[in-house]
Amino acid sequence: MSFIFSKHAEEQLVRRSLERNVVNAVVLKPEQVVEDENDEDIAIYQSIVKEDDTLFLYRIFVNVKVQPNVIVTLYKTTKIGKYYES
């Protein structure tokens, strides 16, 4: 899958201190892909990643209706149970 980062996503990488290689890994091999309830063009790629002794859920919002796919926004959270579908 080919993808690019939107300007906003690039800004979020810096603002949230996210590592690009981790984001790339999640997009290329996500543990889950869920639909965005508000926008059918957006798929949310997510994976649980351990950093130091803390588990984070990386959530990458990707516009899958355009080529190349566009990473619209992204973040990581410790609220895994809220978003991760088991």
Label every PLM stretch briefly.
Residues 1-86:
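Ribonuclease/tRNase effector modules and their secretory precursors
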